[in-house]
Amino acid sequence: LSGGTHQLTVNQRPLNATIQRVYDGGLNAEGSNLSSFDALQGGETLFLSGTGTVSNKNVSSNQSVTLGSLALSDAGATGDTANYSLNNAKLNIVQRPISTVYLTKLYDASTTVQASDLQAMTNLVGSETLTLTGTSTISDANVGVKTVNTGGFTLNDQAGANASSGGLASNYILSGGTHQLTINQRPLAATIARQYDGTKTAAGSDLSSFDALQGGETLTLSGSGTVGDENVANGQGVTLGSLALVNGTGLASNYSLNSASLNITKRVLNSSGSKTYDANTDALAGAITLSNLVSGEALNHSGTATIGSANAGSYTITNLAGITIADGSGGTASNYTLTGGTHNFTVDRRAVSVSGTRLYDATTNAVASDLSTH
């Protein structure tokens, strides 16, 4: 071999490129979206510049690329483009992740999200649209910004869409996007009810009901507000003051106290009285004393009530309709009622006097036949 010529020709190694990108509605295969080469040697790296094209814009795998201006580049790479040639390229178009925003709703104690709650889809290509069907969920029902689990939803094609125009559901995917639902506090109107007490206070402890609690939940009310009139009335608007919602079986943070009204009902009076046996069942107003009046208030009353028996004993006054109450010192009759109270009346035994006369008989005996009562 000595003295001869000995030559080896090293030819360029052909490379096949794989390009991958998210669906964008176009036919381009950009070198900047290079995924891999099939035959780089010795751990070398190369890049791809320029643009090629494919014939189908839709999601697909291994579409043949018309190379166009695609070219190998070694700028910043460890390999040398002189050692390689670009033989062909394939393009993988993968589904485009989209995001969804749902209509803000008031707290409703539900973790269900309906497709009909959809407000907007974002990250769609151009003028393409899709529709959404199905039912899905959020992790909890409480107030806040929630991430929607989209597993129960289905994307549907735009009406009239085909392979060349319009939105195709197969080109998109919900996974990888952001999916948010905002839940706001539900406003509540409280009804407070109490008997007349001579004040303008509306205490939370006198709560009667809320108008819009969800899912059978309960709340209570603390603090107090005020009204403009202390007298019996329905639906007086309350200045809320320190009134505040308190957790019950539900969370107060899921609600807001929007308004309150106060119903002041008549104060129930009690009564008691007594008389000496008089052989009738009348209970005269003059023998009856009223109680449970607001401190500092008095009423006048007149008429006749009825008890169950004329005989001596303790009774309940049964016919209060015969007693009329009227305004008195500081007291307004319309703020009171006798209905519903306790009304007791006692008939006491009547004392009987005895007298009599007889002729002197030298004894101390008083014989009954000589006596009379009066």
PLM regions with names:
Residues L1-H374:
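Short loop/turn motifs that initiate or flank beta-strands
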